[in-house]
């Protein structure tokens, strides 16, 4: 089956002042030749004078073949197919928005192309027709090319009726919903941070337990926090959530509470690993580490209460 392709948006060419994602294909005396990734890889050029606001000493430090770049459109000749681009005129904020738009548009593209493959489309025109009857309908409806379709597809995960007004037959609708669910259903992520908490004063382990319990009080119903002892004075904090950003925020908040509470008792608090999303491999390694330490400490009394602390509601 031939590889199908189509531009991401309804318009075949970008407009002047649009910030677009390109891939650098080659570098010549006049500038860099690039492919506009959102427009089915049509060619554009970044003139050397538009690479940087500073004096150019080494082109390779500014732009490299094979790398993706966010650039702004400064001229379009639709008749001749010429597109002039600038890298130096793109602000950091514009680049971030461009990357976000590209990521979401690419997700929509991946969904629709897979739908086309499942339905055994053989021509690019068939994929374009699917775009016209789905993604571009939402882009036009919400006046947000790239975002309209992504937001609508995301909504369709919980409310498939969003797709009711589209010109789709039963097979197309079924396959589209299956692929939207497969790609856009939220996946729970585990977030982890490693900390050191100790108190060598009179209150000792009681001060540590009190500080950790204070951190656990930052738990919510949707984001319960767990704290496990790795080896004194090191602990691992974890939470599982559908919202990555909120999960990171909750762990950071809990760490701040623990730090404040233990330092009130003249204890010590150090961050060994900032909160981050962990993979299955990380989790497997942590489980092995905890199992090994549990065996080593099996005959040691007095630490049972500190080995694992979970958010609980006091009776």
From Swiss-Prot:
How would you summarize its activity regulation?
A: Activity is regulated by phosphorylation at Ser-49 and Ser-52, which stabilizes the eIF-2/GDP/eIF2B complex and prevents the eIF2B-mediated exchange of GDP for GTP, thereby preventing the formation of the 43S pre-initiation complex (PIC). This results in the global attenuation of 5' cap-dependent protein synthesis and concomitant translation of ISR-specific mRNAs that contain a short upstream open reading frame (uORF) in their 5' UTR.
Q: Where is the signal peptide?
A: none
Which SUPFAM superfamilies does this one have? eIF-2-alpha, C-terminal domain (SSF110993), eIF2alpha middle domain-like (SSF116742), Nucleic acid-binding proteins (SSF50249)
Bias-annotated ranges (Acidic residues): 299-308
Gene Ontology BP, a term: cellular response to UV
Q: How does it assemble?
A: Eukaryotic translation initiation factor 2 eIF2 is a heterotrimeric complex composed of an alpha, a beta and a gamma subunit.
Q: Which protein are we looking at?
A: Eukaryotic translation initiation factor 2 subunit 1
**What is the native source organism of this protein?**
Xenopus tropicalis
Q: Which gene encodes it?
A: eif2s1
């Amino acid at each position: 089956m031939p590889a199908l392709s189509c531009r991401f948006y309804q318009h075949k060419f970008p407009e002047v002042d649009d910030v677009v994602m390109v891939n650098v294909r080659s570098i010549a005396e006049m500038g860099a030749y690039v492919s506009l990734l959102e427009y089915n890889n049509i060619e554009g050029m970044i003139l050397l004078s538009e690479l940087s606001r500073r004096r150019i000493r080494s082109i390779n430090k500014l732009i490299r073949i094979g790398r993706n770049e966010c650039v702004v459109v400064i001229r379009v000749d639709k008749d001749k197919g010429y597109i002039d681009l600038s890298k130096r005129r793109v602000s950091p904020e514009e680049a971030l928005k461009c990357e976000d738009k590209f990521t979401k548009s690419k997700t929509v593209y991946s969904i629709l192309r897979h739908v086309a493959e499942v339905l055994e489309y053989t021509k690019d025109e068939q994929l374009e027709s699917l775009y016209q009857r789905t993604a571009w309908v939402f882009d036009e409806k919400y006046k947000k090319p790239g975002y309209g379709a992504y937001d609508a597809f995301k909504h369709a995960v919980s409310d498939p009726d969003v797709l009711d007004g589209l010109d789709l037959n039963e097979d197309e609708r079924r396959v589209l919903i299956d692929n939207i669910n497969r790609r856009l259903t939220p996946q729970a992520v585990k977030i982890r941070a490693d900390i050191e908490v100790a108190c060598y004063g009179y209150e000792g382990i009681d001060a540590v337990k009190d500080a950790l319990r204070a951190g656990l009080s930052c738990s919510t119903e949707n984001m319960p926090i767990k704290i496990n002892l790795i080896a004194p004075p090191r602990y691992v904090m974890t939470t599982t959530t559908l919202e990555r950003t909120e999960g990171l925020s909750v762990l950071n908040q809990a760490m701040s509470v623990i730090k404040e509470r233990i330092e009130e008792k003249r204890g010590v608090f150090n961050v060994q690993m900032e909160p981050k999303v962990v993979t299955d491999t990380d989790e497997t390694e942590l489980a092995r580490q905890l199992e090994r330490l549990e065996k080593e400490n099996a005959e040691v009394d007095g630490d049972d209460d500190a080995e694992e602390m979970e958010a609980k509601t006091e009776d």
